[in-house]
Amino acid sequence: MLVRQSHTQISKPLGAPLRSRTTLESHVISPPKLSPQQPTTPNSNMYPEETRGGGGAAAFNYLDGGYDYTAPAQGPAPLYYSTTPQDAHGPPSDGSMQSLGSSPTGPLVFVSSSPQLSPQLSPFLHPPSHHGLPSQSYYLETSSTPLYRSSVVTNQLSASEEKLCIASDRQQSYSAAGSGVRVFEMANETRYCAVCSDFASGYHYGVWSCEGCKAFFKRSIQGHNDYMCPATNQCTMDRNRRKSCQACRLRKCYEVGMVKGGLRKDRGGRVLRKDKRYCGPAGDREKPYGDLEHRTAPPQDGGRNSSSSLNGGGGWRGPRITMPPEQVLFLLQGAEPPALCSRQKVARPYTEVTMMTLLTSMADKELVHMIAWAKKVPGFQELSLHDQVQLLESSWLEVLMIGLIWRSIHCPGKLIFAQDLILDRSEGDCVEGMAEIFDMLLATVSRFRMLKLKPEEFVCLKAIILLNSGAFSFCSNSVESLHNSSAVESMLDNITDALIHHISHSGASVQQQPRRQAQLLLLLSHIRHMSNKGMEHLYSIKCKNKVPLYDLLLEMLDGHRLQSPGKVAQAGEQTEGPSTTTTTSTGSSIGPMRGSQDTHIRSPGSGVLQYGSPSSDQMPIP
């Protein structure tokens, strides 16, 4: 099936030069692979067999393509179709209207030409053709939650013409003035629950939902919702399995946009709400989470907002969002990556090469999960692509280190890099400089153990490390600052409020609450110091060219080197000297000193390492 594209879709991109996409950008902006899903309800509900009123009844069978041509089709009002093939999606004129009874009856697809109401057409079902002629069938998809019922009737298409006929299930009227503007009226709307995909009973707590999910969310926000997932916090939520895991069901409620106090704008309530158009500038600074436009308005655009945030353009659009602390904590706990295994059998005692091979391999695996975790931090995907890459490159080793500290908190004297990779201090002596880093890590683990770090505090500190790394420019001459630092500050405020909220509800006295908060935040400076030490050590290992490094780890390492070129470059000079060049496992040649190339202002989202020749992989910046 051929789908005609408009001129705007095939026009060349303007402005941005072509370049190869980096490994980090591919992980950040890669969309999930979608596979066509079978309808959860019987097909008869989506494509009901209908009978037109009057004397005769025309029977339609939409699945096998059968159509009774002998039965007359009579309706309460005449339906029209267009015979002009110039613009299949435009409104037909009065002169191009012909009565449906004056031409052979055939397959018609009734859709709307309005971009807000017209569903997307995609080839999904292919019923057999009639009379040996090719037929076109469409599976009606919408980008939003509601699915609209449309009638699909059979038609004979000429091989030389493409006719897309437009009508509706109800009576359509065309105005006689002008070019014949159509008035589209939707007859029936079937809406589904955004949480479990069951039939929605109404608009509850900011989204369309069923009675079961509405009642479950009401009970959860009114009482204690200390649910625990027995699996990996990724349980499937549908009509049959929604009761199997309360934790994942509540997480799905928050993800689809359920909020306490969500209210439809087109319905009155017990509290009269002031129209936003008359609020003025003061009302747009900070708004409660229940009054947000994209939360309280019915979902019209579906997932359009989530996809537009990664296009690298606008970044944060809209007012500063204030999210409830309970929701922030719940989302951060649900975003935690799963436990990893090294799956590499290396005989002990370790040598320098085997030790660093194990550690760099684990770091590369954790980086992939770290990027997936960062995309689940509340507000992170609303940032521009430049800011996302900047934050990840600035904090990746600190995030990995605090995760290592949390895994090792219950094992004194041990560092748990993975479930099957547990090291102690003595095993770090095989690598020069590694024992010092191990000592600092074990001391920080002991400090967190003494403070009895809670899981809620850990997830908050981890997110603070990610967002605080790019709050201020490391070097104003060599690093481009964040495009929207105010959005990052707003995200930091939400997470800090969540940390304070948890400490205040932990049972500590009023005097101990600010003291504990200060004790936790002061330890982040020690993690930053360990990260700098580890970065210097990794860069020296790369310059020695003894251990193969992976593409993503190399890009992260070199991106951090641009942000703090002084210390890391000095480590490279002390290790190899200015004339040494090392070759990575991917074949790219990198020198420890690049002269003026390391001090230029970095382009938004551009990677430092260019793997291979940028010939066929060049594409516009997304």
Curated annotation (Swiss-Prot):
One of its GO terms (molecular function) is zinc ion binding. Residues 1-192 are annotated as: Modulating. Residues 193-258 bind DNA. PROSITE patterns: NR_LBD (PS51843), NUCLEAR_REC_DBD_1 (PS00031), NUCLEAR_REC_DBD_2 (PS51030). Keywords: DNA-binding, Lipid-binding, Metal-binding, Nucleus, Receptor, Steroid-binding, Transcription, Transcription regulation, Zinc, Zinc-finger. SUPFAM superfamilies: Glucocorticoid receptor-like (DNA-binding domain), Nuclear receptor ligand-binding domain. Its main location: nucleus. Residues 259-323 are annotated as: Hinge. Residues 324-560 form the NR LBD domain. Residues 283-296 have a biased composition (Basic and acidic residues). Residues 1-11, 35-46, 95-105, 612-622 have a biased composition (Polar residues). A zinc finger (NR C4-type) spans 193-213, 229-253. Coiled coil: none annotated. It is found in: Nucleus. In the absence of ligand, steroid hormone receptors are thought to be weakly associated with nuclear components; hormone binding greatly increases receptor affinity. The hormone-receptor complex appears to recognize discrete DNA sequences upstream of transcriptional start sites. PANTHER family: KNIRPS-RELATED PROTEIN-RELATED (PTHR48092). Binds DNA as a homodimer. Can form a heterodimer with ER-beta. Composed of three domains: a modulating N-terminal domain, a DNA-binding domain and a C-terminal ligand-binding domain. The steroid hormones and their receptors are involved in the regulation of eukaryotic gene expression and affect cellular proliferation and differentiation in target tissues. This is Estrogen receptor.
